[in-house]
Amino acid sequence: MTENKLSPKTKKVYQYLSHLFNNGQLLAGEQIPSEIEIAETLAVSRPTVAKAVNIFVREGKAYRKSGIGTFLRNPAADKKKKKTIGLVFPLIGLSEIFRPITEGIAKLSETLNFSLIWGGQFNRANITGTQTEQMIDFYIEQNVDGILFAPVELTRNCFSINKKIISKIEKCNIPIVLVDGEYHEFPLRSKYDLVGIDNFRAGYVSALHFIEQGAKRVDFLCQPFMAQTVPQRIKGYQQALLDSGITPHKTWVHDIRNFSSKELLPLIQNGAQNIICANDNTAMKFIKALSDADIKIPKDVRLSGFDDIEAARYFPVPLTTVAQPCKDLAEVIIHTMLTRIENPYLPARNLMLDFELKIRESSKIPG
């Protein structure tokens, strides 16, 4: 921490706390004086004390116990102590990539000396702010050292829920690593580390696969309230069209609420033949609707997806898809968190791993 950046009064409190920390006036694990006591001792306001204490906590020199107070850390003991990491993947049951990532993180727990705890998953239709608060309260009670957070999606109030989760974690100065995507809408960027794939490039490569086969039009199919990875995929897909001399039209991006043949047939009738789906689950719904309408893949319509879910290769027509490196993601995610715990003031990092476009029958344009 650069003390010169602090106001004189905040600096005074910070130096007082540092004196307690460095000179052994309080032992590790002992509670520091209350904000009222420090304010009276140093003749400063409580908000000034709170600001200095927050800095001290963020630097890892102290920790809070909810409803009790703030306590000094023992740096040497903390380095040996097994870290506890909380997992917030609320919709793990709806996205297959999170399960292998979670399994990969769990496998690393012994060699990297950390414990992983999970507060459960939510029902998509019934996610509430109360549920998320209860889950975060559980992690706070467990005194976790960090939280891995994959933002909520596919529900109308997902942005407010995500902000509620982040706000509650922030108040306790618990390190956060975002998994897969940002919780802000583009172009906003949060102050937290983010680990995922380069979704812009993945969208670009998916579109290029169709363009290189001679396609002059490529459409993109998504659903409402999807993760912030999807807008990045759309931007990449549109850039590939532009770079190939094709002007992308807004009408080529389809936000589908009802995957019925009745709703999807006009899309095909209006010229959509080569279609990128926002993920494999979206593709699976689309394939069923096409089958109900007796539209053949890849003869009449070609499509691709993202995530390479287990079923993708076993679809009636195997699905071309962007495979995410879940094992590598797990390793980078946990190393990022452990680094963040030890170095809370590092700048926020965007860690983007490579992916593989697995080309199967669903995207092959007939010769």
Regions found by a protein language model. Name each.
Residues 2-5, 15-22, 27, 37, ...:
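Alpha-helical recognition/docking segments in bacterial nutrient-uptake
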Residues 16, 190-192, 248-249, 262-367:
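Flexible loop/turn connectors
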Residues 26-27, 31-32, 62, 346:
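Conserved hydrophobic residue
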Residues 29-42, 267, 357:
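A short alpha-helical element within helix-turn-helix/winged-helix DNA-binding domains
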Residues 40, 57-58:
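Alpha-helical residues within the helix-turn-helix
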Residues 90-100, 119-130, 153-157, 181, ...:
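Hinge/beta->alpha junction and helix N-cap segments in small-molecule ligand-binding domains
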